[in-house]
């Protein structure tokens, strides 16, 4: 008999560790999104680590700005950014305050509230595609910039909470280069995913944009 996922909330101490420890340890954890229409729960299956100002692939690489300020704050908070003029992506701040490390949630399996998630992801061909990719994940969970700075470790709970879930054994975790990261940041094997999980997004190398002529 398979044991039910642990419903104990993750603590701030969990997120206060180095980003390369936190990222693979988030696999199998459960993200609860509480909305006025009901809860949606997602089992994390794919993540990417970004290690602050020392990481050329990180939003914090060039220092603190109005956009990335949450990254420099306490661990356990949510950093949401808007990209390509249409998509949101969700990250979890980790490491010591001021380090500006974060883990991007790239994909997950909707384990509760799939019917609600489907209303937000009408183009998904099946439930495995509901949160297959960071923008799809944020869309399915109705995560946008209004949730930037949310404390996912708040004792009283809130719109976003992480539960202990069922950690993934190390032999089932794979890692490789981060999707779409160019230059020096592209060499780090800091993308982590659950092996053979159908909700994991396909890897795509960085493709330089063509200049208009």
From Swiss-Prot:
This is Putative 3-methyladenine DNA glycosylase. InterPro entries: Formyl_transferase-like_C_sf, MPG, MPG_sf. Its EC number is 3.2.2.-. PANTHER family: DNA-3-METHYLADENINE GLYCOSYLASE (PTHR10429:SF0). It comes from the Bacteria. Residues 165-187 are annotated as: Disordered. One of its GO terms (molecular function) is DNA binding. GO terms for biological process: base-excision repair. It is an enzyme of class 3 (hydrolase). The keyword DNA damage applies. Keywords: DNA damage, DNA repair, Hydrolase. Pfam families: Pur_DNA_glyco. Belongs to the DNA glycosylase MPG family.
């Amino acid at each position: 008999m398979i044991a039910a996922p642990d419903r104990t909330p993750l603590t701030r101490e969990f997120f206060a560790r180095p980003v390369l420890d936190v990222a693979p340890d988030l696999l199998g954890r459960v993200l609860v999104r509480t909305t006025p229409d009901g809860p949606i729960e997602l089992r994390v299956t794919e993540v990417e680590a970004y290690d602050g100002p020392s990481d050329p692939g990180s939003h914090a690489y060039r220092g603190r700005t109005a956009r990335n300020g949450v990254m420099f704050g306490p661990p356990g908070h949510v950093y949401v950014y808007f990209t390509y003029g249409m998509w949101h992506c969700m990250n979890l701040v980790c490491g010591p305050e001021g380090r500006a490390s974060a883990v991007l949630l790239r994909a997950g399996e909707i384990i509760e509230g799939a019917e609600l998630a489907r209303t937000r992801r009408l183009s998904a061909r099946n439930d495995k595609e509901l949160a297959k990719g960071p923008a799809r994940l944020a869309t399915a969970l109705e995560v946008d910039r209004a949730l930037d700075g949310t404390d996912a470790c708040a004792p009283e709970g809130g719109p976003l909470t992480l539960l202990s879930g069922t950690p993934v054994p190390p032999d089932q975790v794979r890692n490789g280069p981060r999707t779409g990261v160019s230059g020096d940041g592209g060499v780090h094997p800091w993308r982590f995913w659950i092996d053979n999980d159908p909700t994991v997004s396909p890897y795509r190398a960085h493709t330089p944009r063509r200049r208009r002529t």
